[in-house]
Amino acid sequence: MQQDPPTSQPHTPQIVDGVKPRGWVDHPAGLHFEYLGIADSRPTRTEYNECWAHQREVHAEVSAHQRPNTVIYVEHDPVYTAGRRTRKEAYPFDGTPVVPVDRGGEITWHGPGQLVGYPIVFLQRGIGVVDYVRRVEEAVIRLVSQYGLRAGRVPGRTGVWFPSDGMGPERKVCAIGIRVSRQTAMHGFALNIDPDTAGFDNIIPCGISDADVTSMARELRRLHGPDAEVPSLLEVAGNLEPILTEMMSFQPYEMSPDIPRREHPAFLHPMP
């Protein structure tokens, strides 16, 4: 997570004597959803830098109250993004592009089979960064529960996880990294639906070495066998819309319970 420090100058147009500037949009006014490529008759992937430039344009408009809160849905070409805490020695050497970005967190992978969502949302007064992140997590937790999957938060860790069990350690299904500037969030979440998770093998995802990465497809197959039905990115994105809309209304909500931390034997007794 990354939050820019306040400055002495106002970042957005101001209401003077009750008169709003031309083009002013009150927040929240619901959420507007943009589907980049994934809703096409022949779905296409979007290059990361192209989408990042679009994010910045949308962020400028939302923070200036010239556009409603917007969620950008996208599936990226293979790429690593390195948050501000990433050390150079953590970069992979497999030839996949690495893009340094201005969000919090460390390095992660994006690619085919992963739904990436960028909520560009003006944070109401009193809504802090942690509260915002918890709301994004809650939306994903509720989403995967619609498919019979029990996920949750792990204390001290960001994102959405499946608990440690006899088959392995805690497994992250959704990574979250944001930046807040001009009271408006950008960047967002990456939900693994059915990616080739080998892309994570060349890095320590988000700098966490004692956990694993999973996907909705992998968890569904664990429950129902190899022929389990796996939803498409478009289906998941559509089902997530009303949940995100509810969470981004910033009304009180009941938070899902945390997953208890349990050390897996593989990390209690490492190989010599």
From Swiss-Prot:
Tell me which family the UniProt entry assigns to this protein. Answer: Belongs to the LipB family.
Q: Do you know which NCBIfam families this protein is assigned to? A: lipB, PRK14345.1
Keyword hit for Acyltransferase:
yes
**Principal place where this protein is found?**
cytoplasm
Which residue ranges have biased composition labelled Polar residues? 1-12
What are the boundaries of the signal sequence? none
Instruction: Write out the catalysed reaction.
Output: octanoyl-[ACP] + L-lysyl-[protein] = N(6)-octanoyl-L-lysyl-[protein] + holo-[ACP] + H(+)
User: What GO annotations for molecular function exist for this entry?
Assistant: lipoyl(octanoyl) transferase activity
Where does the record place the region Disordered?
A: 1-20
- What Pfam families does UniProt report for this protein, alphabetically? LplA-B_cat
Q: Which GO terms describe its biological process?
A: protein modification process
InterPro entries hit by this protein: aa-tRNA-synth_II/BPL/LPL, BPL_LPL_catalytic, Octanoyltransferase, Octanoyltransferase_CS
PANTHER family, A to Z: LIPOYLTRANSFERASE 2, MITOCHONDRIAL-RELATED (PTHR10993:SF7), OCTANOYLTRANSFERASE (PTHR10993)
Keyword match Flavoprotein: no
Function of this protein? Catalyzes the transfer of endogenously produced octanoic acid from octanoyl-acyl-carrier-protein onto the lipoyl domains of lipoate-dependent enzymes. Lipoyl-ACP can also act as a substrate although octanoyl-ACP is likely to be the physiological substrate.
Q: Residues at site: Lowers pKa of active site Cys?
A: K172
Question: What name does this protein carry?
Answer: Octanoyltransferase
Question: GO CC annotations?
Answer: cytoplasm
Cellular location of this protein? Cytoplasm
- For this protein, the Enzyme Commission number is 2.3.1.181
- Where along this sequence does the record place binding of substrate? R103, G104, G105, E106, I107, T108, W109, H110, A175, I176, G177, G188, F189, A190
